[in-house]
C-alpha cells in the first residue's frame, strides 16, 4: 500500500494544485463577502480543506470516467489509472473516501449547508460524464467548481441570497473561459476520440468565446463591486484581473498547445487578484 501511495497522490493531482486554487478563490470570495470581511477561522479551515478534498475526489472520479479515452490523449496517457498502474476500483474507492471525509467536515455546520453539500456532491460526481452529452461541459464544471459559493453564504448567513447565485453565474463564465483554454490543448486528440468540449463547439470562434466569457465574468464583478459599494482597493484588484485576461489573449490567439496551457494555469493569478481586492477592501474599511 505504501508503495502505491505516490500513485494515489498523482491520481488526485496533489502534484498539480492549480485546480484546487481555481475552486478555492471563488469560495474565499464568497466567505469574505458573506461575513463582511470577517470570516470565522473554523469556516476558513472547513472550506479550505473541503475544497482540497472534493477537488481530489473529482480528479479520481474524472480519471475513472475517462479511463478509456485518456489512453488516446498525449497529455493523459501516462496517468496512473490510464496506464494500468492502479485499478478502476481503487480510483472509485478513493473518490468515495475523500468525499466522505469532506462531508464529515461540514457536520458541525447548519442544515442548509449540509443540504447544499448533497447537491454539490451530485454535480461534482456527474460532471466527468457530461462530456458525452453536453456541447459545452465546461459550463457544468463551473457549477461544480463554484458550488462552494452558495454553501459559504449558507454557512455564514443560513440563507443563500441572490448575490450568491450571481457570483455562481460569474464562476460559470470564468470556468468556461479557463477550461476552454485547457481544452484547446487537447483539441486534436478530442476530435479523434469524439469527446465534446467547448473548444470544439466554439470552433474558429474559440478565442473570441474565451474573451467574451472573461468579459462576462469581470462585468458581473463590476456589478458586485458597485452594488456592495467597494472602494479603491477592490477596483485595483479588478483592474489586475482585467490585465490577466488581456494577457491570456496574447497566449491563446495563435491556438498553440503550450501557450494555451500556460493561459489556463495563469488563471490562478486572475482569481487571486480578485480575491486580494475583496480582502483588501474589507481590511482597509476596518472590517
Swiss-Prot record:
Q: Which reaction does it catalyse?
A: all-trans-octaprenyl diphosphate + 4-hydroxybenzoate = 4-hydroxy-3-(all-trans-octaprenyl)benzoate + diphosphate
Q: Which cofactors, if any, are listed as required?
A: Mg(2+)
Enzyme Commission numbers on file: 2.5.1.39
- The residues forming a coiled coil are none
Q: Pathway membership of this protein?
A: Cofactor biosynthesis; ubiquinone biosynthesis
Q: Where in the cell is it found?
A: Cell inner membrane
Q: What is its main location?
A: membrane
Q: What family does the database annotate?
A: Belongs to the UbiA prenyltransferase family.
Known NCBIfam families for this protein?
Answer: ubiA_proteo
* Entry protein name: 4-hydroxybenzoate octaprenyltransferase
The protein's organism comes out as Burkholderia cenocepacia (strain HI2424)
User: What is this protein's gene name?
Assistant: ubiA
Amino acid at each position: 500500500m505504501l508503495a502505491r501511495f505516490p500513485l494515489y497522490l498523482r491520481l488526485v493531482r496533489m502534484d498539480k494544485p492549480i485546480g484546487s486554487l481555481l475552486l478555492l478563490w471563488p469560495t474565499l470570495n464568497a466567505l469574505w463577502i458573506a461575513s463582511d470581511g470577517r470570516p470565522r477561522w473554523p469556516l476558513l479551515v472547513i472550506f479550505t480543506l473541503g475544497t482540497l478534498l472534493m477537488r481530489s475526489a473529482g480528479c479520481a472520479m474524472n480519471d475513472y470516467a475517462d479511463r478509456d479515452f485518456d489512453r488516446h490523449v498525449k497529455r493523459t496517457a501516462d496517468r496512473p489509472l490510464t496506464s494500468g498502474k492502479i485499478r478502476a476500483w481503487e480510483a472509485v474507492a478513493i473518490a468515495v473516501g475523500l468525499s466522505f471525509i469532506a462531508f464529515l467536515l461540514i457536520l458541525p455546520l447548519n442544515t442548509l449547508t449540509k443540504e447544499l453539500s448533497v447537491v454539490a456532491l451530485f454535480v461534482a460526481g456527474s460532471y466527468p460524464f457530461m462530456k458525452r452529452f453536453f456541447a459545452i461541459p465546461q459550463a457544468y464544471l463551473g457549477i461544480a467548481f463554484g458550488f462552494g459559493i452558495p454553501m459559504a453564504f449558507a454557512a455564514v448567513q443560513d440563507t443563500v441570497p441572490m448575490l450568491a447565485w450571481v457570483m455562481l453565474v460569474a464562476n460559470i463564465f470564468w470556468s468556461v473561459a479557463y477550461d476552454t483554454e485547457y481544452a484547446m490543448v487537447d483539441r486534436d486528440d478530442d476530435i479523434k476520440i469524439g469527446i465534446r468540449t467547448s473548444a470544439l463547439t466554439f470552433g474558429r470562434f474559440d478565442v473570441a468565446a474565451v474573451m467574451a466569457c472573461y468579459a462576462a465574468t469581470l462585468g458581473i464583478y463590476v456589478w458586485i463591486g458597485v452594488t456592495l459599494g467597494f472602494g479603491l482597493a477592490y477596483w485595483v484588484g479588478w483592474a489586475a484581473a482585467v490585465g490577466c485576461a488581456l494577457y491570456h489573449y496574447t497566449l491563446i490567439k495563435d491556438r498553440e498547445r503550450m501557450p494555451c496551457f500556460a493561459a489556463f494555469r495563469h488563471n490562478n493569478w486572475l482569481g487571486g487578484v480578485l480575491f486580494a481586492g475583496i480582502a483588501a477592501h474589507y481590511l482597509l474599511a476596518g472590517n
